[in-house]
Amino acid sequence: MSSSVDPSAEDYRREMCTYNQFMEPIYRQALAHLPFQGSVGGLDAGCGPGGLLPSLCHLIGDEGEIMALDASLAHLEAAQQLCEHKELTSRVTLKQADLRTTLPFADDRFDWVWVADVLHPGYFPTPDDPVSEFVRVTRPGGHVVIFFEKMYESKLFPGQPHLDTLYRRYLDYHGRKLTFDNQPNNLHIWLKRSGCEAVQIHAFTMIHASPLTSEVRYYLQDIVVGWFAKTPMDKVTAAGISEDEWNALLQAVAPESPDCVFDHPDYYCMWIALMAIGRKPT
Ligand SMILES: C[S@@+](CC[C@H](N)C(=O)[O-])C[C@H]1O[C@@H](n2cnc3c(N)ncnc32)[C@H](O)[C@@H]1O
């Protein structure tokens, strides 16, 4: 397994906490499908700053414990603070590990493995490798669950076809290097190829509508728009978008603009996530 990126060097805990708040309506739906209730021990692989640990602890019940792994020490530090704040330190063990290597656990150790928004193709060009490791450390009859937000299929400008088409073109260009094997829409296939049975795939949607809460507004404005607004013009034109079209798109989301879409009383965005659940054969 290899990647040019060293995830331990990255610290985006503030963005992750806002992202977790933004995604809350989808997490509620996703968690309701998890077969984790009453389990003794699970693994949160790529736990980040730990935003989902309180919900996972609540879901499994008072007896359950969670091992939470991440490569980033900064994220683990934030997760530690969160666990202290939520009085979960006796139930959660945090550990630094690289998911691109063999996991430091015996075969069949956990009842379940949960991995949310981690197996991005840029970090994991061959997701079958970590997924096989997740299956190895899960007990027979236990479950491996892969969750992915699908920003590329989500809608930032529903009802505004011109902006939506431009944004879609930008996202399509951005995702052009994905292959069948590492495309996150195929997360259920990763589980099947790694030997799981009874694989199910679920889709979840949510809408954030005007008036947006300050967290949602911050996520859309500073993180989503902040991400694409930084794109150099040569990459924008390579995506088939002219400079004028791009400026119109940026103007529509500029916070100081009187026409900023996020301030419109009828604005809404629609987000999508996918989740696949597989069972390790007994
Ligand atoms: C987008 S965050 C998701 C965090 C968390 N699962 C959540 O949903 O809130 C991705 C996390 O994966 C971690 N990560 C990325 N590559 C990794 C690797 N090779 N080994 C361990 N963790 C990794 C990052 O440090 C980051 O915390």
What do these predicted ranges mean?
Residues 4-5, 12, 202-265:
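C-terminal helical/coil "lid" or tail adjacent to the Rossmann-like core of SAM-dependent
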Residues 103-113:
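A short acidic, Gly/Pro-enriched loop at the edge of an enzyme's catalytic core
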Residues 111-126:
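A short SAM/SAH-binding and catalytic strip from SAM-dependent methyltransferases
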Residues 128-140:
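A short glycine-rich, Lys/Arg-flanked "PGG" loop and its adjoining helix->strand segment in the class I
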Residues 145-218, 222:
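Conserved catalytic/acceptor-binding region of the Class I
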